[in-house]
Amino acid sequence: MLEVISTSGFSSFQDMGRNGFRSQGISRSGAADYYALFEGAALLDQNPNSTALELIGNGGKFRVLQDCMVALTGAIMPASLDQKPLSWNSSHYLHGGSILELGAPQNGRYSYLHLRGGFKAPKIFNSSSAQPSAGIGKYTRPKDILEPLEKIPEALKCQTIEPVDRFESTSCRLVESFQTHLFTPKTIKKFVDTEFSIDNQSNRGGIKLTHTGSGFSTSNQLKIMSDMIIPGDIQMTGSGQPFVLLSDCQTMGGYPRIGCIIPPDLPAIAQLKTGRTVKFKFISRDEANRIASKDRKCLEIIKERCLEPIRDPQKMADLLNFNLIDGAVWAKN
């Protein structure tokens, strides 16, 4: 159990999101980086849909109210327990009364704090994912008490995990959308040849892409009938400005979509920090299905990426959790 001492103001509970409510205008939401949920679940031996705390900006400061076990995944943050460093992509025991501090993300946008048993959060439309802009859930605030959904007494070894490679990506794969044909072959070629930069006007709803040169327009761009949209769609505004839609995107949109990023590449582009660059490549639906199948198999065996950590005793904040035996041994030649 944890108490929030300080936070960036944009941290919220997230799971794998809500499905089946798009027709009612309810966004999917869910973690921007679903790989991080699977990694945290593997470290804590629990369901990947367990609710985690998604951290945006400075992670925050937390008081440990009761002994618990946590895992840290996603974009790497400087982490410490009572001012002693904690390793990232790892699980840790926290003793009651200690202070957990998490800094600013270093190699991405979204970091995740997982609690053994999952965080307790209200289920709204079959999900604990918060979307405060839609009146669903809230951001965490100082003095909030973060409790486990389940209290799991059995001991579990601390582990580390080799994260899925997604933080150095410079390209994303996409498939044609229902509206790709509205763009001329010349415009599509220009799009895939262009290097885009991540703009600072980006959030959980979408990423604004900037580039040099004119926009990417279609004929009758502002007269297209609104249609269903999903995370991964790349919309072009009236000025031809591209936006990549993410977890909190709306359910309907009228801007034309030049393509849709395949799900396995969405965490990578979501994690790109402001100023990073990216290019896009169209692939066939058959290839996209093969990649998705490989991704599912990778996640099914993700626990195989877990290892017992090699740790420096001088830097172990949880050293007292281990039995250290001292004594003498007599041996006869």
Regions found by a protein language model. Give the residues of each.
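Conserved "landmark" site that anchors the functional core of diverse proteins
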Residues: 1-333
